[in-house]
């Protein structure tokens, strides 16, 4: 097929279409895997959570109501120090830079979050989806970055609440790591509710959870054209030293 080997592979609800690409190395051509196309979906109807990794598995469960199954957060946890969210489920073994991530969200408190471009517990973005405007609550309702220190807002101060009530809402995160664009959509309006250009983290995992409250998720769908993120420039990340990071993680993981 024009020199490209194409195969179909399914695991944990994922379907990927990898192709073989060519890269110029020195004076010769060397074959290397091209970024893989990825489609993942989880409606939790199977009753299994094999596709997800949790900081505290006992805090999460699948609930059935009226024949519909969804992921429920039973318990919130204290944020980490430096102050940032820790209570979110990550999609196992999947990293992407260019992607569309969609999910249905329902809050029990005032807010929930969607995490993306997750590198480690001190380096990631998250969309904070709140009942509040950022003008009323400076750390609510917007896109935030955790970059080795306390979370910081990068956009969304004037946006309307992403989750104005305790009903289900459809949320979508669109990310293009090449252009740096991040757009977050909520069904409360037609266009993006939050938009920003930021290239700090070009690749990482995706997750769903809350800063310090509880709620529900359903119908998670991820579509990406660069699963695996070849050559992510993670060297640009400003990291704290490894010993300090391990001490901080050990401290923040205590009940």
Language-model features and meaning:
Residues 3-4, 8-11, 233-255:
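Short, low-complexity, charge-dense intrinsically disordered segments
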Residues 32-56, 227-231:
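Extracellular carbohydrate-recognition regions
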Residues 44, 103, 167-195:
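Carbohydrate-binding surfaces in secreted/extracellular proteins
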Residues 44, 220-222:
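Extracellular beta-strand elements of beta-rich domains used
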Residues 48-77:
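Extracellular glycan-recognition surfaces and repeat-rich motifs
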Residues 78-146:
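Secretory/extracellular carbohydrate-interaction modules
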Residues 148-170:
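Short, aromatic/His-centered strand-loop micro-motif at the edge of beta-sheets
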Residues 193-219:
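Flexible glycan-contacting loops in extracellular carbohydrate-active proteins
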């Amino acid at each position: 097929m024009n020199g490209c080997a194409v195969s179909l592979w399914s695991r944990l609800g994922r379907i990927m279409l990898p192709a073989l690409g060519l890269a110029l190395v020195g004076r010769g051509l060397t074959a290397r895997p091209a970024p893989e196309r990825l489609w993942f979906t989880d409606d939790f109807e199977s009753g299994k959570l094999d596709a997800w990794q949790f900081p505290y598995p006992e805090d999460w469960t699948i609930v059935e109501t009226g024949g519909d199954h969804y992921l429920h957060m039973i318990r919130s946890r204290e944020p980490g120090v430096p102050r940032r969210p820790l209570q979110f489920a990550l999609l196992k073994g999947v990293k992407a830079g260019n992607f569309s991530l969609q999910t249905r969200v329902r809050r029990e408190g005032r807010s929930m979050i969607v995490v993306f471009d997750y590198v480690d517990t001190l380096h990631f973005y998250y969309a904070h989806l709140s009942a509040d405007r950022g003008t009323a609550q400076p750390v609510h309702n917007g896109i935030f970055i955790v970059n080795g220190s306390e979370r910081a807002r990068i956009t969304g101060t004037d946006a309307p609440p992403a989750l104005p009530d305790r009903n289900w809402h459809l949320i979508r995160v669109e990310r293009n790591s090449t252009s740096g664009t991040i757009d977050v959509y909520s069904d409360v309006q037609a266009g993006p509710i939050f938009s920003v250009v930021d290239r700090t983290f070009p690749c990482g995992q995706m997750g769903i959870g809350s800063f310090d409250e509880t709620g529900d998720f359903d119908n998670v769908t991820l579509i990406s054209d660069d699963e695996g993120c070849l050559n992510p420039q993670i060297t640009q990340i400003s990291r704290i030293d490894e010993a300090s990071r391990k001490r901080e993680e050990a401290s923040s993981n205590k009940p």
